[in-house]
Amino acid sequence: MSAIPEGSNVTVLNKNEKKAREMISKLGLKKIAGINRVTFRKKDNQIFAIDNPEVYRSQGGNYVVFGEAKIDNFSQKLAAAQEKIQSVSKSPEEIQKDMQLAADQAGDESAKPAAAAEEDDEAPVDAGDLSAEDIELVASQANVSKNKAIKALKEHNGDIVNAIMALSK
């Protein structure tokens, strides 16, 4: 016998499963692809789960499922997940402190650019050959000072649309 190469996908079938598959091929059942998990629930809420099953469908709408069935204890999984969430989650007081700290840091960062922008606005800028109407239009559309509007118009060679777009970013 030759060795099975590494990384190959080999499925070993027992005698009964092999016979069942041969009968299915004779019955004309169609294989359904793309099913990752099948679960069956009994009356007492006991759940049987089959991961990566092979599912076949008959013409009448019945299904045949091949795979290893395992008893799925959903309540244990749920309890473990809740325990994990509780160990990771913070108390409301800790969350409030984190939010306050983040707000304080954001407030400090936003105050610095605003102060720098005010300093830029104080220095008068020469309008040159730009019309007062263009400056007013850019300033009002972009919600900026006239000095910023003049600078943007000069950067874009008097192009109103590009100046407004640059200031709106």
Swiss-Prot record:
Pfam families: NAC (PF01849), UBA_HYPK (PF19026)
Keywords noted in UniProt: Cytoplasm, Nucleus, Protein transport, Transport
Gene3D superfamilies linked: DNA helicase RuvA subunit, C-terminal domain, Nascent polypeptide-associated complex domain
Keyword Transmembrane helix: no
Compartment(s): Cytoplasm; Nucleus
Gene Ontology BP term (one): protein transport
Residues of the NAC-A/B domain: 14-78
Region ranges (Disordered): 85-128
One GO cellular component term: nucleus
Protein family (similarity comment): Belongs to the NAC-alpha family.
Quaternary assembly: Part of the nascent polypeptide-associated complex (NAC), consisting of EGD2 and EGD1. NAC associates with ribosomes via EGD1.
Physiological role: Component of the nascent polypeptide-associated complex (NAC), a dynamic component of the ribosomal exit tunnel, protecting the emerging polypeptides from interaction with other cytoplasmic proteins to ensure appropriate nascent protein targeting. The NAC complex also promotes mitochondrial protein import by enhancing productive ribosome interactions with the outer mitochondrial membrane and blocks the inappropriate interaction of ribosomes translating non-secretory nascent polypeptides with translocation sites in the membrane of the endoplasmic reticulum.
Name used for this protein in its record: Nascent polypeptide-associated complex subunit alpha
